């Protein structure tokens, strides 16, 4: 049975661990790692089937078969290269880190050299399968419009740099418009989906992103519009935010769980 190691015990990491513990995913939850030992302890006390060990990154990489990063873009930069060098397959949740072209090329090269797989779940959006299919021909444009309740954008570097007072926003307000390469830096905890869309389609510079704060919303809304030789594709997802972290949509965690199930399944459905 595949031994899983999870790095990052926040909402997404926790949901993945609970799914494995309940038998939704046919794998062994072997190890956890987090900068906060209290988060590891809190998560392990919720589990019934498995008692994963709390390990350092180095210990985890030596003892598991498959690594799940659900921590941060910083963790992707520091840990994922080590995992690939150790010959481990990796699922990356903080996909925004791959806007860094040098890092992206390095990870892809390491995966090839060490015969490893890198997995990037669809996250909190629908339509990645369609974008993947459309990329077999020419894609002309890709636009992501993200709408969130203002406080769901709290702490974003773009918000803090401009001194935007989110609590004073009373109507729909455009906070950012630009390429995905800049969006993932401006809102690293909010628009990881922009990175996934970029990887599936026309890249970080050509993928356009709009971030809107809307006080009338109680959900995180992602709209994708793609035009190309195939025609036009439009999707809209209204995500319930995580009760633990309003920056994260519940669907993002479900996407990770679904990806793991697909990896382990003999039957593959969809692009």
From Swiss-Prot:
GO molecular function, one term: NADP binding
Keyword annotations from UniProtKB, A to Z: NAD, NADP, Oxidoreductase, Pyridine nucleotide biosynthesis
Residues annotated as the enzyme's active site: 222
Positions that bind NAD(+): 124, 192
Keyword NAD on entry: yes
EC number: 1.4.1.21
InterPro entries: Asp/hSer_DH_NAD-bd, Asp_DH, Asp_DH_arc, Asp_DH_prok, L-Asp_DH, NAD(P)-bd_dom_sf
Pathway membership: Cofactor biosynthesis; NAD(+) biosynthesis; iminoaspartate from L-aspartate (dehydrogenase route): step 1/1
Reactions performed catalytically: L-aspartate + NADP(+) + H2O = oxaloacetate + NH4(+) + NADPH + H(+); L-aspartate + NAD(+) + H2O = oxaloacetate + NH4(+) + NADH + H(+)
GO process annotations (BP): NAD biosynthetic process
Domain of life: Archaea
First-level EC class: oxidoreductase
Note: The iminoaspartate product is unstable in aqueous solution and can decompose to oxaloacetate and ammonia.
Function noted in UniProt: Specifically catalyzes the NAD or NADP-dependent dehydrogenation of L-aspartate to iminoaspartate.
Similarity remark: Belongs to the L-aspartate dehydrogenase family.
Name by which UniProt lists this protein: L-aspartate dehydrogenase
Organism: Methanosarcina barkeri (strain Fusaro / DSM 804)
Source species taxonomy: Archaea, Methanobacteriati, Methanobacteriota, Stenosarchaea group, Methanomicrobia
